Amino acid sequence: MGTFPPTSEKRSMEFHYPNFQNDMWRVYGLVFFDDKEHFRKGEEKAFDADKIKAFLSEAGIASCPTVLKAIREKGNASDAFLKVVEPVPLAEVLEQIPDCKHIGTTGGKATEILLSLLPEKVKLPKTGETIPFVFNGRELTLTRLPSTSRAYPLSLAKKAEAYKNFFKACGLQTK
């Protein structure tokens, strides 16, 4: 779960993490295919939304933002200037995926927003840390993953390693 998409002029596709400068789909390419360009749309500076959706569906990975409506106060993709107007209805989302046991958040802001939706106060985990929590009687885990923004000071390889560890812990096959 991330935060909120960038402004429309920064989008290279109509799906989650649409900014070509964001490394999310490069991370997934490395984790599952050992190829950071796996989800790139040919030579275009764009990702292939259909290929991504097909992969996520086949792998059993859900993706959604933690925010439905927001104001980007500076007009950029920085979460530092993201004002949440309406968070995701977490109960409704989880009802649609009854087999979900693990949630990964991409960065601090997404983690903070998700934790704000829980009925009981839960301490903010450190990057890479996994914590158990209960939501509507359901036992889940939350892993705070590193942001895939290029502004986040961690190499692509280290980000991919963190995501690989998360997906392995969830029982998924990685490369």
PLM feature spans:
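N-terminal nucleotide-binding beta1-loop-alpha1 segment
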Residues: 1-3
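C-terminal capping/extension of enzyme domains
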Residues: 6-11, 18-20, 27, 74-91, ...
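Short, surface-exposed acidic-centric catalytic microdomains
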Residues: 9-82
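Residue-level marker of positions within ordered structural domains that often coincide
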Residues: 6, 33, 68, 108, ...
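Short C-terminal domain-edge/linker segments immediately following a structured domain
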Residues: 29-36, 92-98, 172-175
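Generic structural signal for beta-strand residues in well-ordered domains
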Residues: 54-56, 96, 135
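Internal catalytic-core helix/loop-beta-alpha segment
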Residues: 58-117
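Secondary-structure boundary/capping signal
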Residues: 36-37, 101-102, 122
